[in-house]
């Protein structure tokens, strides 16, 4: 409580940033709404709401300041989207290399998710389960490492980082799916789920060594080692099942 009470300037700056982000989202959303061509009355009411909000913000902070903030946020959004695209591309390259090591055809992954292929070959079904579990492990490892590092670096100000990342993630998704709001529903749900999982009721907050919970909980390194052991055991069992299926086919 003392940290939040003493952070008056930070709170005001965060409120200003939140208002500017809302204004930016309000300016981006009408384009997506108009591109879908949903009813004139709905678009007009939405535009009136956005115009009212824009006028109130302009009268509060000044029109010149709002325009400068819009330009700054537009440039910041472009750089942020470019950086996230590069990060996602790097993760995809690492993921494809892992699949290549497992002997999977990365160029045609849809063949492993085909219902006909899965029903005709039980080995494909087991391989599909292994790929899903491996993807879950890879995603958990990436998110766990990222948020653990952020929690160690920022400490009790981690909640500010969560709010900023959540806002920028929403901006990124709306920017990528501009004109197709229906396709943005699933990524937004994923971002909201990650936001709540990393909150005070989340796994990483409760069990991290520097968190407010019991310090006797296992560290992140021990959890990663445990996950690696589970993946090794899963690969061994999967190989045994595939070998037994091959032997039964040979007989």
From Swiss-Prot:
Keywords: Acetylation, Coiled coil, Membrane, Mitochondrion, Mitochondrion outer membrane, Phosphoprotein, Proto-oncogene, Transmembrane, Transmembrane helix
Cystines in this chain: none
Positions where N6-acetyllysine occurs in the chain: 229
Residues annotated as transmembrane: 13-33, 125-145, 146-166, 185-205
Subcellular localization, as worded in the UniProt entry: Mitochondrion outer membrane
Pfam families with a match to the protein in the record: BRI3BP
Topology within the bilayer: Multi-pass membrane protein
Tree of life domain: Eukaryota
Protein name: BRI3-binding protein
